[in-house]
């Protein structure tokens, strides 16, 4: 496949620049609608490390969670023009604790911003306000539908404090790319015997 071949070429090229570096990366390319995995890369050199970072390395996913949050918002009456005030904010939570997230580089609009603007600049204040408005259980429940079990229901979930791997992240994003159609990602289409009979 042209795309997966191009991806492999890019990884080989990049590895030439980082031969002496210990930095690793991973990547998955998925075909929307079919959920077919076209390419998966778990590291730059299988000979030196068989650890598959695409499926085994769990990390906080950060702002990549926001499209899922805003999908929920749109499903619950928000529009791209829905606004919240963007300014430094301390949130008082149900357990009487407080939470004070910040925007990247402490940059704030100090005025109402729209959902469309918020996702364009990855505004954290807007994300947390949206998350708390919807109820923290909603985002956690959506994530669990993708088979991710250990999801903490808290305010910071809106900013991607979820620990998971890019296989699971690709699984979630593929559902969005497939217009809501959800199928598990797969690498094997079928298995045949030497007579061509389909065994799987």
Can you annotate each of these PLM segments?
Residues 18-47, 142-144, 189-193:
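A short, well-structured edge-of-sheet supersecondary motif
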Residues 146-199:
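Active-site-proximal helix/loop microenvironment
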Residues 15-16, 25, 51-59, 101-106, ...:
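Second-shell loop/turn segments in exported
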Residues 20-25, 48-68, 81-87, 156:
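Short active-site loop at a secondary-structure junction
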Residues 134-150:
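Short, charged, amphipathic alpha-helices and their helix-cap/turn boundaries
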Residues 78-139, 182, 194-200:
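Conserved catalytic neighborhood of penicillin-recognizing serine enzymes
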Residues 35, 58-86, 118, 172-176:
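Active-site SXXK
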Residues 1-12:
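Single conserved hydrophobic/aromatic residue that forms the stacking wall/gate
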């Amino acid at each position: 496949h042209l795309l997966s071949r191009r991806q492999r070429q890019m990884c080989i090229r990049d590895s030439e620049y980082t031969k002496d570096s210990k930095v690793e990366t991973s990547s998955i390319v998925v075909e929307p609608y079919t959920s077919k995995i076209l390419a998966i890369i778990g590291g730059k050199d299988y000979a030196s490390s068989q650890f598959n970072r695409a499926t085994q390395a769990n990390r906080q996913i950060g702002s990549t969670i926001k499209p899922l949050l805003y999908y929920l918002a749109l499903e619950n009456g928000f529009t791209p023009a829905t606004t919240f005030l963007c300014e430094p904010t301390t949130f008082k939570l149900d357990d009487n604790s407080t939470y004070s997230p910040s925007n990247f580089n402490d940059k704030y609009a100090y005025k109402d911003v729209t959902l469309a603007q918020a996702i364009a600049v990855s505004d954290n204040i807007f994300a947390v306000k949206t998350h708390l408005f919807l109820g923290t259980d909603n985002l956690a429940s959506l994530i669990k539908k993708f088979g991710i079990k250990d999801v903490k229901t808290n305010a910071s979930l809106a900013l991607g404090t979820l620990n998971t791997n890019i296989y699971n992240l690709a699984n979630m994003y593929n559902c969005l790319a497939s217009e809501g159609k959800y199928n598990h990602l797969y690498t094997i289409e079928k298995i045949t015997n030497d007579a061509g009979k389909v065994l799987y």
